[in-house]
C-alpha cells in the first residue's frame, strides 16, 4: 500500500506579517466558547500551530513546558472545533471561537477560570 505524504500547512505571508510574537516566537490565544461566549482558556501558538489550526479547524497549541505541539482533546476527547480565528488590533493576541466538547480545562472544569475568583461581580441589594 502506498503511503500518502501530506505537506505541513504554512501560514500565509500576509497573516505572518501581521503577527507580533514574543521573544519565544509565540502569540497568546484566548479561547472562547462560540455558543455561550464563556472564556475557556488561554494557550500559546506559534506560526506552525496557527497554520495547523487554520488548515484543520482543530485547535493546535504549543506547550511551553513540554516543548511540543498539542491538539486540544487528542488524548482527553475534550476537543475544540474552531469556528473562527481573529487577530486583535495590535496583532499580538489571537481569539479563537470554538465548539467545545466537555471541559476545556485540564482539571475537567468547563473553563480554566472556574476555580479562583479574585473579584466577584457586585450584587445590588
Swiss-Prot record:
Zn(2+) binds at residues 89, 105, 112. The keyword Amino-acid biosynthesis applies. Pfam families: PRA-CH. It comes from the Bacteria. Its main location: cytoplasm. One of its GO terms (cellular component) is cytoplasm. Mg(2+) binds at residues 88, 90, 92. Transmembrane segments: none annotated. Its EC number is 3.5.4.19. Binds 1 Mg(2+) ion per subunit. It catalyses: 1-(5-phospho-beta-D-ribosyl)-5'-AMP + H2O = 1-(5-phospho-beta-D-ribosyl)-5-[(5-phospho-beta-D-ribosylamino)methylideneamino]imidazole-4-carboxamide. Homodimer. This is Phosphoribosyl-AMP cyclohydrolase.
